[in-house]
């Protein structure tokens, strides 16, 4: 590797909005994030299913038709 062209790597503290702190190496000093693996719904199991439905399902729901 060429000397003098690469950014300096330093210890970085990542702080989440929920209060969780992680330490890693990066070119930045501190990083603040809104979600992490401790508070994100996917990892905590509190996720909701977003079922928008297709065009046919919406039509059937709107006009009271059932699939029999």
UniProtKB/Swiss-Prot annotation:
Superkingdom of origin: Bacteria
BP GO terms, sorted: translation
Gene3D superfamilies linked to this entry: Ribosomal protein L31 (4.10.830.30)
UniProt-annotated binding residues for Zn(2+): 16, 18, 36, 39
Cofactor(s) recorded in Swiss-Prot or TrEMBL: Zn(2+)
A molecular-function term among this protein's GO annotations: structural constituent of ribosome
GO cellular component: ribonucleoprotein complex; ribosome
Co-factor note (free text): Binds 1 zinc ion per subunit.
Pfam families: Ribosomal_L31
InterPro entries: Ribosomal_bL28/bL31-like_sf, Ribosomal_bL31, Ribosomal_bL31_A, Ribosomal_bL31_sf
Protein function: Binds the 23S rRNA.
Assembly description: Part of the 50S ribosomal subunit.
Name of the featured protein: Large ribosomal subunit protein bL31
Recorded name of the encoding gene: rpmE
């Amino acid at each position: 590797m060429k000397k003098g062209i690469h950014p300096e790597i330093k210890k970085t503290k990542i702080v989440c909005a929920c209060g969780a702190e992680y330490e890693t190496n990066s070119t930045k000093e501190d990083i603040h994030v809104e979600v992490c693996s401790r508070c994100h719904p996917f990892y905590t199991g509190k996720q909701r299913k977003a079922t928008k439905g297709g065009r046919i399902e919406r039509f059937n729901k709107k006009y009271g038709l059932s699939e029999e």
